[in-house]
Amino acid sequence: MAVGALIRLAFHKHAVDRSRALQKHVPANVTAVRDLHYGGADAFLDVFYPSEHQNDERLLPAIVWIHGGAFVGGDKSDVASYLEILAGRGYTAIGINYSLAPGARYPAPVIQANQALSFLNAYADRLHVDPRRLFLAGDSAGAQIASQLAAAVVDPSYAESLGISPAVEPAQIEGVALFCGVYDVSQIDRRGSFGRVLETVVWSYFGRRDVTADPRLAEFSVIRHVTQEFPPAFISAGNADPLAPQSVAVADAIRAHGVAVTEVFFPPDYTRALPHEYQFDLDGANGRRTLERLTTWLDERARAGGSEGAPHR
């Protein structure tokens, strides 16, 4: 079996276990609309919103979440339970699928995520989406994709380099929530087993084994494209996540441009080692606290961005 397939299988097993563990935390008062087709063959999205609005036309601040999976795996179903939990707190939460590597190459997922925003703009009234109050979010590879899309929305030259005509205006993006992503490949330690996995992932996504001289790698590394127009950010990673330095670095870069950053990080000697994607562990106190921090941040941003204020709970 190819290494990429092994990575995909490992992510799938972990995601299934994680989703099963999250089920007990999912509220009953959430309505789901699944598998809406927003574009090409792999372009489907799920929408979750509070059931109390099933028969009304209330528009809610919307969280557009892009799943992880190292660009070669993952599915919107992996984050569905977490999105249902967020929807139960007064939001419309959307999980999107995108085409995976090696079948789809960079920057196809970023382009598809932009298409999803176009779809949500067009059908906002039917899906309880307030298009004036959108949040981009993602975990792992999805965080990287979300960060690139956020940068493209606010920077026309960056959007042009990606081949994107942004589907939304900068003012529509209230913020971006990024968990355990990659934001500057040049700063990742490629030694050991993790380095070998990274090389396989990059090879699959970019279509060439050695991408060190590929100008697209600098484009991919969104930390180099942050400007003062970048949306306010919520950023977190676990202390035992090998990608945690990436989150710290991008938080510093965003803040250096005068943009508000809310971060949840943990010291290296923290009493518990928190792994990649720790935020989905709601059986643990740290995952629960981060969910509360995220919800508070979302509420504050939603209140600042819309006349209807924060969601009612």
Question: Over which residues does each language-model region extend?
Answer:
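Alpha/beta-hydrolase superfamily serine-hydrolase fold, recognizing
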Residues: 1-313
